[in-house]
Amino acid sequence: MALKFTTAEGQAITPITVPVMREIDRLAVQETGPNLYQMMENAGRNLAELTLTLLGESRNGSRVLVLAGTGGNGGGGLCAGRHLANHGLAVDYTLGDRDGLSEVTGRQLSLLELAGGREVDPVSPETGEADIVLDALIGYSLLGAPSGRSAELIRWLNAGNSRIISLDVPSGVDADSGLTPGEYVRPQTTLTLAWPKTGLLPRLTGELWLGDLGIPPAVYTRAGLKNFRSPFIAGYLVRLTASEQ
């Protein structure tokens, strides 16, 4: 069965595979822009905006926890945490692996700490439960079953009562196939980036949103998307409805 998505305005969107998404990222970073820092900032701000929207009037006094991996997905989550801290929310974070942090993600971590974000061990009973957890552990670069600290954090997250928003792809879900080779996050909401992927099955993502990274239309066309039409005419965040045909 083929997975299709539709926007609130009725635009039909055919999902893409991970290799196509990698090519879109490559073209943007190496040739056209926006660069990696800019796309990470756009991803984080979109995630922060969606978080504030979902919190609504309950945002005052809310606590957010960011679970961040070492790469671009983790950087987007940490960036979102900084924006939320700037808007008055209490923001904590934990890292899947501090030693492997990429340069751009490390920069986002420094900015979050400057905004008041604090590192915690969420598994510790002393930490307490967050209102919302931002899952930014793995993203579309999953290779096999999550292991080590990432697997531990996923198990802990699924056992709790916090509302979960996954960034791009629920951690542990194969973005191409929708297969789950091991532990995987079970979010209420997923914000996927740039374009939906073929593995974003509705039973795995919860409510699905699409976030604009600011990539020029010509990049999508060069990557092989025929008759490209931007879904972001109405805004930076687009609600998607899935159907399997």
UniProtKB/Swiss-Prot annotation:
Please state the Enzyme Commission number of this protein.
Answer: 5.1.99.6
What Gene3D superfamilies does its record include?
Answer: YjeF N-terminal domain (3.40.50.10260)
Q: Which cofactor does it need?
A: K(+)
Domain annotation YjeF N-terminal: ranges? 21-221
Which positions bind (6S)-NADPHX? 72-76, 139-145, 168
Q: Which GO terms describe its molecular function?
A: metal ion binding; mRNA binding; NAD(P)HX epimerase activity; nucleotide binding
The cofactor remark states: Binds 1 potassium ion per subunit.
**Keywords assigned by UniProt?**
Isomerase, Metal-binding, NAD, NADP, Nucleotide-binding, Potassium
Q: Which InterPro entries match?
A: YjeF_N_dom, YjeF_N_dom_sf
Q: What reaction is this protein's catalytic activity?
A: (6R)-NADHX = (6S)-NADHX; (6R)-NADPHX = (6S)-NADPHX
Q: Name one GO cellular component term.
A: P-body
Q: Name one Pfam family in it.
A: YjeF_N
The residues listed in the UniProt record as binding K(+), with positions renumbered to this chain, are 73, 135, 171
Say if the entry is tagged with keyword Transit peptide.
no
| Biological-process GO terms, alphabetical | deadenylation-independent decapping of nuclear-transcribed mRNA; P-body assembly
Keyword Metal-binding belongs to the record: yes
**PANTHER family, alphabetized:** ENHANCER OF MRNA-DECAPPING PROTEIN 3
Its job:
Catalyzes the epimerization of the S- and R-forms of NAD(P)HX, a damaged form of NAD(P)H that is a result of enzymatic or heat-dependent hydration. This is a prerequisite for the S-specific NAD(P)H-hydrate dehydratase to allow the repair of both epimers of NAD(P)HX.
Its family remark reads: Belongs to the NnrE/AIBP family.
What is this protein identified as?
A: NAD(P)H-hydrate epimerase
Please name the source species.
Dehalogenimonas lykanthroporepellens (strain ATCC BAA-1523 / JCM 15061 / BL-DC-9)
